[in-house]
Every structure is written in structure tokens, then in C-alpha cells.
């Protein structure tokens, strides 16, 4: 068994840094309201006892700030330590505090707002100094319009005895302790009695008067005397005491089943798993599609079903959409699922994307804050069932996708490749049909008469003979000579015929003598009284010689061959046989191949279109069966547990809503049947569900890089299998026991406590190399401009992301504002903050006001300064911008955050306030270990534009030679922004395009010819660029109109050789282009070569489209 004590120790040590254990002073999220209670509340008995009575008996505590107008001067200094207008001061403080609570709720789903009273302080036996409220009472803060009044609505369902101080004590003692505090009321004496059981004694105050909370340091406590005190302080603030339920769950697990940690965290790697083989053999069979996913998302969904999977989702790669589909797949396979995240925004996004199918999941981000929303889910479900139920829906068969479609497409590509690769033999040489198609000229080859193409080289040799030509000329000359000698050539032929038929010399001589005398040829049968003359014998000899020579020249007599050889010699065919062979083959022997080629290309387009059509139908079918499943879940429970089901559904109509924790646990079994998916925060899951092994079939955890390992143990414990999603290149967890707003001041990064948090092990980092499978999402969708993601893709993700510009992306993607007179002083830059706020006000007067916007600062003080200035301006347009939500109820307002708090956010426009000037050598959290991850999160939030405010030129900042990777990358990024803003981005090396296979010379020549023709015909109307690298992709040609990409052309596209390549490089490349609003057309080289007019018309048709819509052609 492994020793997991280090996990427990880290958990306990982190607890000692929580504001519910040690609170030195009030903060922006914790207010001292003791004097406000005495001066402004409607409480008659303003002692601690009077306040306790009110909490136990009344529903709210009201405050009238206008009473503060009567307090000034010395009273203000004595009561509040404030110079000036007390009323205005508290109006401002209340306004800021109210906004902090709303921001906290948006990010966590829980207000975590409590009254803390009284405060206990001292030193425990382990020398831990503690100072925090003894009791916590949940409240809701309500404010009047002009902040003249506010009130606290008391929630007696959330009363906690300080669980942190107790938890640290019993864990360090390694003892079992049962906290029997009655959480239905506030009882200070009972709370102190619980602490006395742990041997804590407190010196009590002399009176019950409420006291102001003073600032203290740990050094103020005497470690030798160890005196503990109780002070009648009252604090109002954000305290993460509900998160202590996870702490308790963890302790229960460790104490009752310590061996289970070995099982939960064991190395589950499948050493025999071949990811490449999985991708090659991948098909959708058995996987349901709730929406259109890219191929890497489909891989993740398929792999997730086997469980114990890590899904790495870099920024903007569709991680939430992937999770939605995973949840749907698990639900359709009748699995019980718990989906959790630290950020409620991540939960909201997933839940909202379920749309009208949301009844498959039960959503509860906050146990107490959203009762109405929680209970309304059941009433909505009943209405959905009533409106949609039909018994015929219960007999739907599960849809099945034909996994052979990719094979069919690959088969057509293979056929096409085989046709191109067909070897054509000319006799001595062999050529691919593709080369012949690409290179053949239009020549007159009608005179080449051969049946078999493999005899072409032999024909060339025979019909290119200069010797034969000369022999033919000799033949013609000799023939002329014969015609002259024998009066005409016909006489020669007759005499030749006689000579060859008659062997009698006397007869032959007689004929020749007669020919000489009469110039005619006789045919005697016999000669009786004739004696051959000497002349006759000479003529016979001459004839015999002429016939012999004539016969020897007979094979050179062909006039046709003579003309052919003349042509061949004139064309230098022997030296230039290839183009003639190519042209001759295409014209006389290629018909069958060409017909097969055209047919295959048609079949290929048809197969791709069919695949996409089937995918579309499959998504519809999957949604139909999901709807049927939702109805069936309700129907089955209606059949078996009708009364209980209807009671659940009608709970929302009760005037007083029941406590969710009690009600949820009471109905847990029924709710699990009704909703196969439960969506919760970590705290909600710990409070609502039993701390039971394998309570769910799967647990799905999002944003897991920000989750401490020990915090995740109780969630992992509840699941049989896990699916972990996140990004190891983003933020590691910050100390979640501290109020988020109090983390990351620059000075804090100098101490060891926060540095320890930076080195902490997140759930994602710990399990990454222990999970069964690791899968990566690659297609990047968030950034409209490739330049917004190119830097981080190159520097952080090693060019693994697939991205490109949207066809409609703005041209001005980076704007750099140089701040004049900016100075980094007291951890902030005042002038830069002014410039940022001024810019925000400018944008409210433009069309940009309709977009979403976020301001990201590189340290907390700068963020607080900018927020303070915005508050002070009180601009109605800025206020509306800050509060904006979309149609789904998701917060999309203007935010101001530091880099620690923006993971998971995205906005159309991101404004960076760097703050630092060139005098700085360390950039706070960016310069610490993991700073590159912080920078990565910050610079990947923008969808459309980044605006950078900085005081000096990028080259003036220190960091390029720093040992800190974060510092180095920050300065590199500043240089990058400047270059992009000045349209000098091409000088930077951020090549992300996938390598292309080299092209043959003949392919390049044809491509050049095609380009020249495009320029000639379309060049006046469009700008045409060739070999365009666009993000991760390259195109042969791109037509631009008004600098916008109008049409991309893949000329002679590379063919895939595997199923993986078909999916990743063909089908989903084209689908990605569609989502990026690019038009694409494929032009096959044979298409251009054989029918250039048709190709040009095809391009004209594409270019006449009035809108940029993708169309596969």
C-alpha cells in the first residue's frame, strides 16, 4: 500500500491558510460590520446576544446607511477609523463588496456569503495560530437602488460551526471526532462546549458589546502562554466553509477505507493500447452523436466510454461540446453519471448546450442560493412529459451508424490512386498514367499506327532510321534509272517478270533483241532457229543485274514509311519520344482509363456527400432517441412511483421551498432514476450525495488542471470509472481555501506559501501519466483570426493545434496602445488604468459595444484599480455592459480580472493592461514556475481582437534572457503584438502548416500553367495567391476579394492512404473549413488537362456566389 499521508498533510496545511482558519484583517471580500450594526441596523439590542436572537428568530437584518450622514469628524475616526464622509465611504465599500459577491457567484455557483460571529483566536497545541469566526450563518445581500439601504436575508439552513479549525485539530491528532453541534440555530455556548471537548478554552470578553475587528499578525500571539480569546466581532464575507464537506469526506475515506486510494489513483496505463491503430480502425458504431463533432472529438467520446480517460482540451477546441456528447452517450447506455467542475460557468455551458434535452440531467451548482431554479427543473420536466409523451415513442430502436462509410470513401480514393499509378509501358520505358495525364501535349499523332502501346519505342526506332531514308532515296533514283534504261518502268517490270519465270537463255535473248529493235516485249513460247547475239547476251546480263539490285531495294520502297520517317526526323522523335508517346496514348489507348477516372471521381464526391448526409441523419436519430429516453425515464417512474414522482415535480409550487440538502438525500434514489446525469460543483456533490464507493458508474471532472488531487478524491471515490478533462498547459490549482480575490498579489508570490501552491499537484497532472488513455482535441474554434492562437500554438502546444482564419475575420486583430507617462509604482500603473477606462468609454460609443469584452491584468492591484475607476465613473453604458447575459442566461458581461481568474472565460475583445514598465525585472506570477501556463490562459481568451496597453516598447522590457520561461514568453508576446499591430507578422516564424509531400516536376509545371491561366482570366477582379499557408492548412490557390478569402482551390490534392487520413485530412478538414466559412473547390489535374473550359466555368460559378458559404464541388 502507498503512503498517502502526504495528501492529507497537504490538505491540512492548506486549511491553516484558509480565511476560515486565519484572518489577519478585513479584505475586499470580508467586511467588519459590528459598528454598522450598532449605527445603522434596526436591531434594538446591539449586543452579540441581541444579534444571535435576531438570527434565530427573524428573517432579515436591515441597515439604513443614511444614518451615517450624522457621523463625521472625531466620531468617524473613533468608530470607523475613517477621515471624511463616512456615508460616501460605506456606500462605495458596499458597492464594491456587492459586486465581488456577484462575481463570486457567477464563477462558483455559490455565494458563500456568511455572517461570521464571534471571532475566536489563539494557538493550538501544534503551534498553529488561528483567528476566525466561531459560527457562520448563511445570508443573502440585498441592496436598495441608491445604496442608501441594504439588508441581509438570513438562511438558517446554513449554520456551521467553524469546520476548518476543528478539521485541522482532529486531523493533526489523527483522532475520530463527532461534531454534534445543532445546526438549526446559532448557539455560542453549545459551540464553545464542542471546542471544550477538543480541549480548547477561551477567555471571554467582559461585556457582550459588539467590537470592531482589528488588524493582527501571527507574531502578535504569544506561543508560550497559548491564551485563546473570544471577541464579539461580526464579519460579513465570502467564506468557503461549505467546501469543508469535501475535507470531511476525504477524512472519512482515509480513516475507513485507506486502501481505496491505491485503487483510485493506481497506474491504469494500457501498454498494449495503440492510439494510431485506434484512429485507423475508428468508426462511429456504438457511439451516439448529439451534435456535429470533429474527428478528434469523436475519438474522445468513443474512448471515454471505456473510462479512466484523460481528455486534453487546449483553449477553444470544443471541450464542452465533447463533454455534452459524452454525457449523452453515457445516459443512452443507461449509466449513472456525476459531472463536476470548480467553475460554475463550465457547468452552465454544458447544461445549456443540452437545450430542450436538458431533462436528461439534474443541475445543482449551489445548494442554497438557487432553490427556485433547482426545484423548477422538476416542474419543467413534468410539463415536458405532458406536452410530448406518446406511447409510440417508447418503442424506438437505438440508431446504428454504418461504420463502413469511411471505408467506402477510402476505397474510391484507392481506386483513384490505382488509376493514377497505372504503369504504361512504351517498350523501353514505363510511366504512370498520372504523369501522362499531366504532361501530354496536343500533337498530331494520327500517322502513328500501332495497336500495342508497348511497341511504341520499337516503332520509333524503326521509323526514325536515317539509313532507311537514304536507301529509299537510292531506290527512287534507281527506279528512275530503270525507267530510262528500259524506256519506261513498266517495260522493266515486264522483263523482270519474264526473267523470273523463264530460265531459257535463248528465249530471253530473243525477247531482248526484239525489244531493242521494236521497243516492245513479246512472249514467245519457243525459239527454233535463233542464235543469241552478243548484244542480246549483254542486255540479258544487264537485266539480271538490274533485277537483283531492284529486289535488294524493295524493302525501302514504302512511300508511307518514307513520309513517316521524314516527319519523325523533322520532329526529332527519337530524341523526344515521351511527349509523342503521351499524346498518342491519350488519344488512342486511354479511353477506358479516362472513363474509370471520371467515374471514380464522381463516386468519390458522392460517397463523401452520402457520409455527411448520413451523419446529419444520425444526429437527428440520436436526438430523437434521447428525447424518447427522457420521456421513458419519467414514464417508468410514473408507472412504479407515481405519488413520489408527482410530489417531486410539484415541490416548486410550494410557497416555502424545502432545504435542498435534506430533500435531495431523501429522494436520491428516485432522482438518480429520473436523471441519469447529475451536474454539480464539488461542494454540492459532497453535500448532497452519499460519500459512497461507486455511487455512480462514471464521474466526469472538467477544468481538472485547477483541481487539487485531494479535493477530487471524494468525487473519484463516488465513481466506478473516471473521465477527466482539462489542459495541463493551463493553470494549476490556486489555493482554493483562500478567497479567490485575495490570491496573487505580487508580494504574496514572494513567500513560500503561494509558491507551494504553484508546485501543487493537480488532479489532471497527477493522473495524466496514470490514466488508461490520453486523448487530445486539436481543432481550434475560438479565435476568428489565426494570429490570435498562432503564438501559443507554436510556443506552448508544439504546433499540435489545427486552426485557421475565419473567412470573415476582422483585419485589425491586434491594437497596441502605448501609454504616455505610465509608471509602475506601488504594484500598479495609474496612468495605464486611466487609459484603459477611457478606452472602454470610447468603445461604448461604437458598434463594439454590442460585443463581449474582458480586461485582463497581470496583477491583482491593477485589476482592482481599474474596477475602482469604472465604479467611480458610474457610466450607465459600462454598468449595463458589466451585467450583460446572453439568451441562455450565461454571463457574458464586461469583466476585469487578473490572470489567475480567467481560465474558462472567453470574450470577443480582450484588453490587456500590462501595468509593468521597463524598470521591472520580475513580472509577478508570470515570472514564477508555471508562469508560461498563466500567460497561455490569458492570451487565448479572445475571439476577435486583442488590445494591449503598455508603458514602454516591447524591446525595452527585461526578460528575453531570463531563466524564467514565463518572463521570456511574456516579452516575446509583447514583441509579437507589436509586430502584428504594425502588419509585420510575416517576419515572425510561427509556421504551423502541416508538411506537404513534394510534387513531381510535371505536377508543378501543370500548376504553373493553371495559375497563369487564372491570372489571365480572373486577375483583374480578384487577387490570386498561390501556395497559401492558412493556419495549419495550405491551399494551392486562394482568390481574395477586398482582402477577404473568397475561394480556396485545392489543385491536384494529395490522396489519403488510410482511414485515419480520410477522416482527419479530408472529411473533417472540409467540415472545419465550412465552420470557418471558407469556400473550397477541388480541381483534379486531369480535369484541368482534359477540360480546361469546364474547369474555368466551374470556377466562375463558384466566384459568382454572393455569400461566403462552403460548398463541396
UniProtKB/Swiss-Prot annotation:
The protein's GO terms of the molecular function aspect are: ATP binding; helicase activity; hydrolase activity
Family from the record: Belongs to the DNA2/NAM7 helicase family.
Binding-site residues, ATP:
313-320
EC no. given is: 3.6.4.-
Pfam families hit by this protein: AAA_11, AAA_12, DUF4011
Output the superkingdom of the source species: Bacteria
How is this protein named in the record?
A: Uncharacterized ATP-dependent helicase MG140 homolog
Which InterPro entries has this protein been placed in? DNA2/NAM7-like, DNA2/NAM7-like_C, DNA2/NAM7_AAA_11, DUF4011, P-loop_NTPase, SF1_C_Upf1
Q: Which UniProt keywords apply?
A: ATP-binding, Helicase, Hydrolase, Nucleotide-binding
Identify the species of origin. Answer: Mycoplasma pneumoniae (strain ATCC 29342 / M129 / Subtype 1)
Q: What class of enzyme is it?
A: hydrolase
Q: Where are the transmembrane segments?
A: none
Amino acid at each position: 500500500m502507498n503512503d498517502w499521508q502526504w495528501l492529507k498533510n497537504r490538505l491540512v496545511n492548506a486549511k491553516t491558510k484558509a480565511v476560515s482558519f486565519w484572518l489577519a484583517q478585513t479584505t475586499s471580500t470580508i467586511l467588519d460590520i459590528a459598528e454598522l450594526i450598532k449605527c445603522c441596523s434596526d436591531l434594538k439590542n446591539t449586543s452579540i446576544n441581541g444579534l444571535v436572537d435576531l438570527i434565530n428568530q427573524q428573517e432579515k437584518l436591515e441597515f439604513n446607511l443614511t444614518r451615517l450622514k450624522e457621523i463625521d469628524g472625531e466620531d468617524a475616526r473613533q468608530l470607523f477609523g475613517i477621515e471624511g464622509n463616512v456615508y460616501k465611504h460605506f456606500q462605495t465599500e458596499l458597492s464594491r463588496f456587492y459586486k465581488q459577491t456577484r462575481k463570486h457567484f457567477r464563477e462558483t455557483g455559490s455565494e458563500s456569503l456568511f455572517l461570521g460571529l464571534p471571532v475566536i483566536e489563539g494557538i493550538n497545541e501544534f503551534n498553529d495560530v488561528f483567528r476566525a469566526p466561531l459560527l457562520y450563518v448563511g445570508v443573502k445581500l440585498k441592496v436598495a437602488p441608491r445604496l442608501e439601504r441594504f439588508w441581509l436575508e438570513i438562511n438558517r439552513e446554513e449554520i456551521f460551526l467553524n469546520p476548518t479549525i476543528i478539521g485541522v485539530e482532529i486531523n493533526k491528532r489523527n483522532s475520530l471526532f463527532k461534531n454534534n453541534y445543532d445546526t438549526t440555530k446559532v448557539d455560542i455556548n453549545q459551540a464553545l462546549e464542542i471546542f471544550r471537548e477538543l480541549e480548547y478554552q477561551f477567555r471571554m470578553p467582559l461585556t457582550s458589546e459588539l467590537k470592531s475587528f482589528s488588524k493582527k499578525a501571527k507574531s502578535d500571539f504569544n506561543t508560550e502562554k497559548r491564551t485563546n480569546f473570544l471577541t464579539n466581532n461580526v464579519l460579513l464575507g465570502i467564506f468557503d466553509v461549505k467546501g469543508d464537506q469535501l475535507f470531511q469526506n476525504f477524512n472519512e475515506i482515509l480513516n475507513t477505507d485507506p486502501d481505496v486510494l491505491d485503487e483510485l489513483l493506481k497506474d491504469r496505463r494500457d501498454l498494449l493500447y495503440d492510439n494510431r491503430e485506434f484512429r485507423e480502425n475508428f468508426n462511429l458504431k456504438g457511439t451516439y452523436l448529439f451534435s456535429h463533432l470533429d474527428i478528434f472529438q469523436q475519438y474522445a467520446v468513443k474512448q471515454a466510454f471505456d473510462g479512466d480517460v484523460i481528455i486534453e482540451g487546449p483553449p477553444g477546441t470544443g471541450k464542452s461540446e465533447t463533454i455534452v456528447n459524452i454525457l449523452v452517450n453515457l445516459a443512452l447506455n443507461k449509466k449513472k453519471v456525476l459531472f463536476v467542475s470548480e467553475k460554475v460557468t463550465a457547468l452552465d455551458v454544458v447544461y445549456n448546450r443540452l437545450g430542450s434535452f436538458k431533462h436528461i440531467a439534474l443541475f445543482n451548482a449551489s445548494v442554497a442560493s438557487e432553490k427556485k431554479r433547482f426545484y423548477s427543473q422538476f416542474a419543467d420536466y413534468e410539463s415536458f412529459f405532458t406536452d410530448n409523451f406518446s406511447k409510440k415513442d417508447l418503442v424506438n430502436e437505438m440508431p446504428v451508424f454504418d461504420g463502413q462509410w469511411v471505408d467506402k470513401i477510402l476505397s474510391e480514393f484507392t481506386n483513384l490512386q490505382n488509376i493514377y499509378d497505372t504503369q504504361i509501358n512504351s517498350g523501353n520505358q514505363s510511366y504512370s498514367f498520372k504523369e501522362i495525364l499531366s504532361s501530354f501535349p496536343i500533337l498530331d499523332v494520327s500517322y502513328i499506327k500501332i495497336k500495342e502501346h508497348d511497341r511504341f519505342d520499337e516503332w520509333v526506332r524503326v521509323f526514325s532510321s536515317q539509313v532507311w531514308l537514304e536507301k529509299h532515296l537510292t531506290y527512287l533514283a534507281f527506279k528512275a534509272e530503270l525507267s530510262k534504261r528500259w524506256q519506261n518502268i513498266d517495260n522493266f517490270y515486264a522483263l523482270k517478270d519474264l526473267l523470273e519465270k523463264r530460265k531459257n537463255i535463248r528465249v530471253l535473248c530473243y525477247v531482248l533483241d526484239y525489244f531493242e529493235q521494236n521497243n516492245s516485249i513479246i512472249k514467245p513460247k519457243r525459239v527454233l532457229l535463233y542464235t543469241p547475239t552478243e548484244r542480246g547476251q549483254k542486255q540479258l546480263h544487264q537485266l539480271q543485274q538490274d533485277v537483283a539490285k531492284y529486289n535488294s531495294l524493295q524493302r525501302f520502297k514504302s512511300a508511307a514509311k518514307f513520309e513517316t520517317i521524314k516527319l519523325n526526323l523533322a520532329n526529332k522523335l527519337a530524341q523526344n519520344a515521351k511527349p509523342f508517346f503521351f499524346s498518342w496514348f491519350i488519344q488512342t489507348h486511354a479511353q477506358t482509363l479516362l472513363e474509370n477516372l471520371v467515374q471514380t471521381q464522381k463516386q468519390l464526391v458522392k460517397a463523401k456527400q452520402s457520409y455527411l448526409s448520413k451523419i446529419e441523419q444520425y444526429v437527428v436519430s440520436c436526438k430523437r432517441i434521447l428525447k424518447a429516453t427522457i420521456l421513458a425515464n419519467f414514464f417508468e417512474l410514473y408507472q412504479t412511483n407515481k405519488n413520489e414522482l408527482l410530489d417531486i415535480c410539484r415541490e416548486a409550487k410550494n410557497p416555502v421551498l424545502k432545504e435542498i440538502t435534506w430533500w435531495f438525500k431523501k429522494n436520491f434514489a428516485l432522482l438518480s432514476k429520473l436523471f441519469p446525469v447529475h451536474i454539480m460543483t464539488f461542494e454540492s456533490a459532497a453535500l448532497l450525495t452519499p460519500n459512497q464507493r461507486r455511487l455512480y458508474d462514471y464521474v466526469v471532472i472538467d477544468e481538472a488542471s485547477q483541481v487539487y488531487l485531494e479535493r477530487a478524491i471524494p468525487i473519484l471515490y463516488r465513481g466506478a470509472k473516471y473521465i477527466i478533462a482539462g489542459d495541463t498547459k493551463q493553470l494549476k490549482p490556486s489555493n482554493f481555501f483562500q478567497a479567490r480575490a485575495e490570491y496573487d498579489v505580487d508580494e504574496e508570490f514572494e513567500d513560500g506559501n503561494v509558491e507551494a501552491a504553484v508546485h501543487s499537484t493537480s488532479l489532471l497532472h497527477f493522473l495524466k501519466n496514470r490514466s488508461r488513455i490520453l486523448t487530445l482535441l486539436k481543432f481550434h474554434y475560438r479565435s476568428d483570426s489565426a494570429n490570435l492562437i498562432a503564438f501559443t500554438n507554436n510556443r506552448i502546444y508544439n504546433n499540435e493545434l489545427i486552426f485557421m482564419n475565419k473567412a470573415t475575420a476582422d483585419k485589425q486583430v491586434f491594437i497596441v496602445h502605448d501609454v504616455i507617462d505610465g509608471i509602475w509604482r506601488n504594484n500598479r500603473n495609474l496612468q495605464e488604468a486611466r487609459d484603459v477606462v477611457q478606452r472602454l468609454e470610447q468603445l461604448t460609443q461604437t458598434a463594439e459595444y454590442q460585443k463581449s469584452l474582458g480586461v485582463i491584468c497581470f496583477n491583482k492591484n491593477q485589476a482592482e484599480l481599474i474596477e475602482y475607476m469604472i465604479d467611480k465613473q458610474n457610466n450607465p453604458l459600462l454598468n449595463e455592459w458589466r451585467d450583460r447575459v446572453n439568451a441562455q442566461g450565461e454571463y457574458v458581461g464586461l469583466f476585469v480580472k487578473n490572470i489567475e481568474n480567467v481560465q474558462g472565460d472567453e470574450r470577443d475583445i480582450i484588453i490587456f493592461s500590462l501595468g509593468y514598465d521597463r524598470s521591472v525585472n520580475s513580472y509577478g506570477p508570470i515570472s514564477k514556475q508555471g508562469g508560461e501556463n498563466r500567460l497561455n490562459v490569458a492570451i487565448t481568451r479572445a475571439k476577435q481582437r486583442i488590445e494591449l496597453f503598455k508603458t514602454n516598447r516591447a524591446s525595452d522590457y527585461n526578460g528575453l534572457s531570463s531563466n524564467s520561461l514565463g518572463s521570456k514568453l511574456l516579452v516575446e508576446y509583447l514583441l509579437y503584438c507589436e509586430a502584428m499591430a504594425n502588419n509585420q507578422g510575416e517576419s515572425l516564424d510561427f509556421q504551423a502548416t502541416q508538411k506537404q509531400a513534394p510534387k513531381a516536376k510535371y505536377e508543378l509545371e501543370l500548376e504553373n500553367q493553371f495559375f497563369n491561366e487564372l491570372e489571365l482570366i480572373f486577375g483583374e477582379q480578384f487577387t490570386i495567391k498561390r501556395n497559401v499557408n492558412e493556419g495549419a492548412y495550405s491551399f494551392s490557390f486562394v482568390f481574395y476579394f477586398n482582402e477577404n478569402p473568397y475561394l480556396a482551390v485545392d489543385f491536384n490534392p494529395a490522396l489519403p492512404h488510410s482511414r485515419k487520413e480520410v477522416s482527419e485530412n479530408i472529411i473533417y478538414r472540409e467540415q472545419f473549413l465550412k465552420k470557418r466559412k471558407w469556400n473550397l473547390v477541388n480541381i483534379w489535374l486531369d480535369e484541368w488537362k482534359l477540360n480546361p473550359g469546364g474547369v474555368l466555368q466551374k470556377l466562375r460559378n463558384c466566384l459568382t456566389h454572393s455569400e461566403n458559404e462552403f460548398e463541396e464541388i
